[in-house]
Amino acid sequence: MSIAWSCFVLGLFALASLQVALANDCAQKTFKTGIVCVCNITYCDEIPDINLLSGQAATFTTSKSGARLHRDVVYATNSDPLTSMHFTIDSSKTYQTIQGFGSTFSDASGANLKSLPDQMADTILRQYFSDSGLNLQFGRVPIASNDFSSRVYTYDDNLEDYNMAHFSLQREDYQWKIPYMQMAQKYNHDLKFFAVPWSAPGWLKTTNSTKGYGILLGTNQDTYHKSYVTYILHFLEEYQKNGILFWGLSTQNEPTSGSDKKTKMQSMGFTAEFQRDFIKLDIGPALKSSNAGKNVKILILDDNRGNLPKWADTVLNDKDAASYVSGIAVHSYQDDESDKHLTQTHNNHPDVFIFGTEASEGSKSKDVDYGSFDRAEDYVSDILDDFNNWVTGWTERNLVLDAQGGPSWVSGFADAPVIAFPALAQFYKQPMFYAIAHFSHFLKPGAVRIDHSLNMPNPEIERSAFLNPDGSKVVVLHNKNPLAPYSLSIKDTMKSTDHYQVHLSPKTIVTLYIQN
C-alpha cells in the first residue's frame, strides 16, 4: 500500500471517528440560567463509551460552560505531577455497597411519556434504564395517586368495603404506569421496583379524606388496620398479575407530613411508634404470609434525614419490628441538616441499609428552570454527601415532567431531568440528567465506596471514590468554585507508581474512570 493511500485511509478513519464523536454531542439550546440538550424523534445525544484498555483511564466532564460528559483519555505517569493538591484512593478499605440509582413512575411521568411519539418515549426510557444510558436500577411506584397526579383517586372508595371486594386498579395504572415499567424492564431486566402509599382511602382515615393531614383509623390488628393491609396486598397482587414484582415497600411516604394541618397533598400521619407497631403487628406478618409480598423488603421512615437517628432507633430497637425491616428510606429536602444523622444511624443499625428514595429540585419555587447548572450541582452535592455517609441508593422524584413542572393536581410543580414538549415533538435533557449520570452510568451494581483523602482541606472540592466488581475504579469530583480552577494529582495506593492528573475548571463535575 502506498504512503499516499495509507494517509488517505487514515484520514477517512479520523474523519469518521470525528463524525461519530460529534454525533454524540448535545444539541445545545441556551437559556438565561444555562444550557439544555434538545432531543427529537431523530436525534438525541448519547453518553460516550468508556472504551478503555486495561490500565487506561478517562475523565468525563460536565460544566456550566456547556460540556456534557465530555470524554478525555488520561494517561498515568510514574512520577507525581507538580501540583500541590493530592488526592489518594485506597481500595483496601471499603465501606457500604452501592445498590444503585432510580427514578419514579409517577402519573405525571407516564402522562408526559404518553404525550410524546412512541419512539421518543422509548428513547427516554432507554436513556434512563439501559447500561448505555443512566443505567438506573430502581423504580419507585406510588400506590394510587400522589401530588404528581392529575386527579385524586384510590383503588377502593367504597365506604366500609373492609374486605376490599371492589378494589380496582385505575386507568393511570394501565395507561401511565404499568406500560412504561414494562418498557423500562426491556432495557434493564434486573430493574427493581419499590412501592409506597401517600394515603389510605379517605374512609379509613380520621379525616375521611385522602387529602391533607389525618391518621389511620383504629388500632393494630383491628378491622381498619386489616382492611388497609388488604388494600396494600391487593395492589401488589394486581401488579403481579401484570408481570410486575416488587423488590420493596415503604409503609408511608413522608409520615410526618400527615400530622401537619398545612399539608394539602395526599398524606397520612405516622409517628415512629405507630410505624413500629404497624410493621410488627399488621403489615409485616401479612407480607410474609402472602405470595405477592413474601420477598418484599420493608423500608421505614421515607422522610427527611432530620428525623434520624431517633426514628430508626424507635422502630429498630424493637426486635420484633426490626425482624421485618430491611432498609431506612430518606428524602433530600433537609440535606442542610447535618450528615452526621446518617452516619449515626448507620452506626446504630449497621445491618439495615439506608436508601435515598426521593430527591427533586424546584419543589420550593414550584418551577422548571431551563438549563440550571445550580440544580445539577445540588444533585451532585446531595449524592456525594449521602454516599460519603453510608447511603446506598438515590432516587429522582419524576422521570419526565411538562413545561410547567407537572401535571400536579395540587399545583406542586417541580423540575425534572427530562422536560417534555409534545407540541414540538421534543424533550429537553436538563443538566440534572448529566449530574446523575456522573454516578449511575459508571457505578455498576455491587460497587463499594472506598477510602479517599485530600492532602489539604478544600470545601470547594466535593469528592468520593468507588470500586466496581470488575476492579475498575470511579472517582467523582465537583468543583463548586465559580472562578478558581484546580489541578489534582490522583494516586491509587494499590498501584503506587500510577498518578493521574485531573484538571477541574470552575463549576465543573468530573468522573475519573480507571479501567482495571
Swiss-Prot record:
Keyword Metal-binding among UniProt keywords: no
Gene Ontology molecular function terms on file: glucosylceramidase activity
UniProt pathway annotation: Lipid metabolism; sphingolipid metabolism
Top EC class for this record: hydrolase
Reaction catalyzed: a beta-D-glucosylceramide + H2O = an N-acyl-sphingoid base + D-glucose; a beta-D-glucosyl-(1<->1')-N-acylsphing-4-enine + H2O = an N-acylsphing-4-enine + D-glucose; an N-acyl-1-beta-D-glucosyl-15-methylhexadecasphing-4-enine + H2O = an N-acyl-15-methylhexadecasphing-4-enine + D-glucose
Any Pfam family: Glyco_hydro_30
One GO BP annotation of this record: glucosylceramide catabolic process
Family: Belongs to the glycosyl hydrolase 30 family.
Name of the featured protein: Putative glucosylceramidase 2
Organism for this UniProt entry: Caenorhabditis elegans
Taxonomic lineage: Eukaryota, Metazoa, Ecdysozoa, Nematoda, Chromadorea
Gene field: gba-2
